[in-house]
Amino acid sequence: YNPASNQCQGF
């Protein structure tokens, strides 16, 4: 999980 790629991942 990369916080720089702001996608809806559910983390």
Curated annotation (Swiss-Prot):
Chief place of localization: secreted
One cellular-component annotation, GO: extracellular region
Keyword Secreted on entry: yes
Alphabetical keyword list: Disulfide bond, Protease inhibitor, Secreted, Serine protease inhibitor
Domain of life per record: Eukaryota
One GO molecular-function entry: serine-type endopeptidase inhibitor activity
BPTI/Kunitz inhibitor domain boundaries: 1-11
Subcellular location: Secreted
Tissues/organs with expression: Expressed by the venom gland.
Role description: Serine protease inhibitor that inhibits trypsin.
Family affiliation: Belongs to the venom Kunitz-type family.
Official protein name in the record: Kunitz-type serine protease inhibitor C10
UniProt organism field: Daboia siamensis (Eastern Russel's viper)
Origin organism lineage: Eukaryota, Metazoa, Chordata, Craniata, Vertebrata
